[in-house]
Amino acid sequence: MSPPVASRVGVGVIVTRADGNLLLGYRIKAGETPSWCLPGGHVEPGETFETAALRELREETGIVTQRPADIFAILQQLTARHTAITGAAQVSLEDNLAEPQVTEPDVFARWAWFPQAALPTPLFPASDAVLSLWQSAPCPERWRAYSVL
């Protein structure tokens, strides 16, 4: 008998400042290859993608904003081990004042702002997929995107 297939629903949040730079965290979670990652995480039961995006932003970075989280796509990771659905969100901050904090030192070593044309590598797979779609590039292999109109 094959093992049960797990499903996961998450959200990835592109956070941009007034100067156009976007926020990425250096992810150092045990058992994973270190990579750069958007704020994000699991959607809790009964929670919308928008609510999850703002909650994860607050929990992971300490950034609290009244700006809306706009969902622009739903992405599906196509693997044999599990089904992963990621809501792609964007939050546009009004200024350049937000200073992210490392609130989960077992997951992130640091947060930094990057120009869109100079993103660091490697990117966390889900973040790579969200950013590719946002930049009008093809989705990475084993990902499928569904635009939200």
Each language-model region and where it sits:
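Short, flexible, glycine/charge-rich loop motifs used to bind or transfer phosphoryl groups or to couple energy/partner
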Residues: S2-P4, Y26, L78, Q101-V102
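Residue-level preference for beta-strand/loop junctions
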Residues: S7, P34, T83-I85
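Anionic group-transfer/hydrolysis microenvironments
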Residues: I14, I28-K29, A117
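Acidic/histidine-enriched, glycine/proline-rich intrinsically disordered or flexible terminal extensions
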Residues: S136-L149
